[in-house]
Amino acid sequence: MSNKMWGGRFTSAPDAIMEEINASIGFDQRLYAQDIAGSKAHAKMLAAQGIVAAQDADRIAEGLDTILSEIEAGNFTFKRELEDIHMNVESRLAELIGASAGRLHTARSRNDQVATDFRLYVRDTLDALDAQLADLQRALAEKALAHAATVMPGFTHLQTAQPVTFGHHLMAYVEMVARDRGRLADARKRLNECPLGSAALAGTSFPIDRDATAKALGFDRPTANSLDAVSDRDFVMETLSAASICAVHLSRFAEEVVIWTSPSFALVKLSDKFTTGSSIMPQKRNPDAAELVRAKAGRIIGALTGILVVMKGLPLAYAKDMQEDKEGAFDAFSALSLVVAASAGMVRDIVPDEKRMEKAAGQGYSTATDLADWLVRALNIPFREAHHITGRIVGLASDRGIALHKLSLDDMQGVDARITQDVFSVLSVVRSVRSRVSYGGTAPTRVRTQAKRWLKKLGVPA
């Protein structure tokens, strides 16, 4: 005889392997707080609608509060044979308050229950991530403001391209994280509809008040279609998509930290707080925090891929496949939280080698574009012609193994007689960055303005 809560029509217990593959309590116990909150709101609504007696609803609420305290104190025993968080909570509720516990599941299915729990959990996760990302932006903007005029090489193809400032480079990530926060906020807006009351798939014949439960749980409204409500996992996929893009951004930053801290570049230093040593090479200082930020992006992207593949072939409405929606998501959310925290820590810890940065910024003829721009402005030469002239001058300097500013005026006039002594005023990396005053440019004045604007927006006093 089956003793499962769903076992009325079953005459024997499930096989041990069936219990093992069917159970989700090993991971969905994370939903305990959301499950209890949803059940309390549901019980209160049932009483308000006269579907259950007020005293039963009160006993249910008291019992659920006791269970919450037990779980948070570590005194609750989760049982695999009860499958999931819903049955574990309901079983314990029955032990605490007796028959009244059986009233709780009136007008409700585990299908709408888990959909509600998971939305609440993802919403809580989104709120926590947004706060973390705002802190990362503060760290970036503060460091950018401090280094608005610190010259460093800007790269394309990982080859020195033009001088920029360290502050400008960091502010690029402030903008990326702003888009990440926007995507996560958009996901939260679409998530914030309440499935509770959709029951298994078709709704319920009981006179429930779905608006009341939606409001009690902080949702904007109840979901409009019961089939969609119990079979929808868009909110997980969308959140994981935004999380994956965010992880890619932070992976790119981490890759740069790995490169910059390499002795071959030596542009920045991380302290002992965010590096580790080698078990055999005593001189090593390894940027493990950055490397793990980079690696965890793969786990987060993997979770997105996993749920997309799980959901791609499911007919409406619920199928047990959807139990696989949580474990990867939980892992990805935890990973992203750690990635954001580690990134903020590294930003605050990182110290640029300003002299080496400025020297590196001048390598690779990085002011060649400034030379071409000067030819256009000062001599009214069309840019394409100026580009060609500059290329010849760079070739001359390269052949001699010297920097552009080491060429003589005669050398340059040998390429084009129109060039004057004023050309040397634009060949300094410091002058180069100061000249990039267009909106969004690397000029220190622009970087300071942008950093201060963001810090004000993020609530940091001037």
UniProtKB/Swiss-Prot annotation:
UniProt-annotated location(s): Cytoplasm
EC number: 4.3.2.1
Chemical reaction(s) catalysed: 2-(N(omega)-L-arginino)succinate = fumarate + L-arginine
Alphabetized InterPro entries for the sequence: Arg_succ_lyase_C, Argininosuccinate_lyase, Fumarase/histidase_N, Fumarate_lyase_CS, Fumarate_lyase_fam, Fumarate_lyase_N, L-Aspartase-like
Statement: the UniProt record of this protein carries the keyword Lyase: yes
Keyword entries, A-Z: Amino-acid biosynthesis, Arginine biosynthesis, Cytoplasm, Lyase
GO (cellular component) term, any one: cytosol
Broad EC category: lyase
Highest rank taxon of the organism: Bacteria
Gene Ontology molecular functions: argininosuccinate lyase activity
UniProt key word Lyase: yes
Pathway per the UniProt entry: Amino-acid biosynthesis; L-arginine biosynthesis; L-arginine from L-ornithine and carbamoyl phosphate: step 3/3
GO biological process: arginine biosynthetic process via ornithine; L-arginine biosynthetic process
A Pfam match: Lyase_1
Family: Belongs to the lyase 1 family. Argininosuccinate lyase subfamily.
Annotated protein name in UniProt: Argininosuccinate lyase
Species of provenance: Xanthobacter autotrophicus (strain ATCC BAA-1158 / Py2)
Gene name of this polypeptide: argH
